[in-house]
Curated annotation (Swiss-Prot):
Superkingdom of origin organism: Bacteria
Gene: aepA
Annotated protein name in UniProt: Exoenzymes regulatory protein AepA
Gene3D superfamilies assigned: 3.10.310.70, Metal-dependent hydrolases, Urease, subunit C, domain 1
Taxonomic classification: Bacteria, Pseudomonadati, Pseudomonadota, Gammaproteobacteria, Enterobacterales
Similarity comment text for this entry: Belongs to the metallo-dependent hydrolases superfamily.
Listed GO MF terms: hydrolase activity, acting on carbon-nitrogen (but not peptide) bonds
Signal peptide: 1-21
UniProt KW Transcription keyword: no
Keyword check for ATP-binding: no
InterPro entries: Amidohydro_3, Metal-dep_hydrolase_composite, Metal_Hydrolase
Function: Involved in the control of extracellular enzymes production. Stimulates PEL, PEH, CEL, and PRT production.
UniProt organism field: Pectobacterium carotovorum subsp. carotovorum (Erwinia carotovora subsp. carotovora)
């Protein structure tokens, strides 16, 4: 089976009568994504629906009765874009509090100065959330990480959480940790993978990995359904302004986001087709996770909102030494996928059998290999359901060939935020020359007929503003 995007109303002569109010757009360069009619010059819209795409001859009856005739003067018209991997509701959580964007090239002292300046300019801020730092740029000794004590110099009373550029790690000040009731007795969500950095007495230092960090943000007072829904609406308007008509929100671990999305949907304010994903919860069994997703689907799946996607994580990121790689990192760490091969296979099979698409985060070559093998083992289960591997930074040796063997229902999704220039040298040092030259083999995969999609992941706050 082949997945092709088609315009719904490309056929000529869709209606026999043209006695209705409509707008005709002419003299356009229209790209249709239809092999039988790849280009056109006229587009007719009636009450928000495309009723004709074609040439001037077929458009004559529409022009004769048009309520509006728009000359596009050769401008290009494209079908609506589909955001294939994003976290708009996560951005809404970030925007729900006072937010500061941090340049990934900044040092620790520069970041602290930036946050102090923000609080001076906004003395009524009750909390502060920031995002964008890169550990390698902080100017710390090899292996050192920022701590709560660093952020306590910014404020001891205002809760502060700072995400890294990939949002797979971050750190908080003592006030934020206290709000979340994080102390030496707080268990790590997944020891060694989703966890709190600790001192030699077991006390959290303030630096956190994966869901440990998200749990601290989730506990902050600004993270309320009404605040998140309010901030999500302008984010979706920004997507609209960029030409997006559908979004795959692959999910998060926040307790407010699904309800916030559903609130907009119920109010008729969800103006895009919105697919929402469910994050696998390591504290639950496979059966319990599938049951949780089914419950969300039954409660919220209606109108423009679809909840039918199961999200798995194979690993973290290269910059945090948590991407699962065949070779050890320079510090000697060998990182395995977050899930065993049996867990991966069981989760993929269960989700597909339940009728859910499966969307998987994989950065390192070993992570990619694990999920490719799991998809291959379960290829015959509900083959009409899309499988997606996201990011695909470092390809395993047979990665392109394995993608090609499953190209009928497997999408290669990637994102540009793991290809930034200021991390180039750091990445080469961490993964070595061979793996470095096996990054983002998108062209090779596309030439093999693999469907390659790109996405924003996080719609940057500066872009929104």
């Amino acid at each position: 089976m082949k997945f092709n995007v088609k315009m719904l109303s490309v056929t000529l002569g869709l209606f026999t009568s043209h006695a209705f109010a409509h707008t005709v757009y002419e003299n356009a360069r229209i790209y249709t994504v239809n092999d039988r009619q790849p280009t056109a010059s006229v587009l007719v819209v009636d009450q928000g629906k495309i009723v004709y795409v074609g040439g001037n001859d077929g458009a004559k009856p529409f022009k004769a009765t048009a309520t509006e005739l728009v000359d596009l003067e050769g401008k290009t018209v494209l079908p609506g874009f589909i955001e294939s991997h994003a976290h708009p509701a996560t951005v809404a959580v970030m925007e729900a509090g006072d937010f500061v964007y941090v340049d990934g090239a900044r040092t620790l002292s520069q970041i602290l100065s930036q946050l102090k300046a923000y609080l001076v300019a906004h003395p009524k801020a009750n909390y502060l959330l920031a995002q964008g730092f890169n550990v390698a740029s902080l100017g710390l000794p090899q292996g050192a990480l920022p701590t709560a004590a660093d952020l306590d110099t910014v404020s001891e009373s205002v809760p502060i959480v700072v995400y890294d550029s990939g949002m797979h790690a971050g750190w908080a000040n003592s006030a934020a940790l206290n709000v979340a009731h994080v102390d030496a007795n707080t268990p790590d969500p997944i020891p060694g993978k989703h966890y709190f950095e600790r001192d030699n007495k077991g006390n959290p230092t303030g630096f956190m990995h994966e869901s440990a960090m998200h749990n601290v943000v989730d506990a902050q007072q600004f993270n309320a359904v009404e605040n998140v829904a309010e901030k999500l609406q302008p984010i979706l308007k920004t997507y609209h302004s960029l030409g997006f008509t559908a979004i795959t929100d692959v999910g998060d671990t926040f307790s407010t986001t699904v309800a916030a999305i559903a609130r907009l949907n119920e109010q008729g304010k969800l103006k895009v087709y919105y697919q929402r994903g469910y994050f696998y919860d390591a504290a639950k069994s496979t059966e319990q996770n599938i049951a949780s997703l089914k419950g969300l689907r039954e409660k919220y799946h209606q109108g423009n909102l679809s909840i039918n996607l199961y999200k798995l994580f194979m690993d973290g990121t290269i910059e945090m030494d948590s991407g699962a790689m065949y070779q050890p990192y320079p510090n000697g760490n060998v990182v395995e996928p977050f899930l065993s091969q049996k867990q991966i296979n069981d989760n993929v099979a269960a989700a597909l059998k339940a009728g859910f698409s499966v969307h998987v985060h994989a950065i390192g070559d070993k992570a990619q290999q694990s999920i490719l093998d799991a998809f291959a083992a379960n290829k015959k289960i509900n083959p009409q359901l899309a499988r997606v591997i996201a990011h695909n930074q470092v390809f395993e040796p047979q990665g392109v060939q394995k993608f090609a063997a499953m190209k009928d229902n497997l999408f290669l999704q990637t994102t540009p935020n793991w290809a930034v220039m200021y991390e180039k040298d750091e990445t080469k040092t961490k993964i070595g020359q061979d793996a470095y030259h096996h990054q983002f083999l998108l062209g090779q995969a596309a030439r093999e007929g693999v469907a390659v999609t790109s996405a924003l992941t996080i719609l940057r706050i500066p872009l929104m503003r």
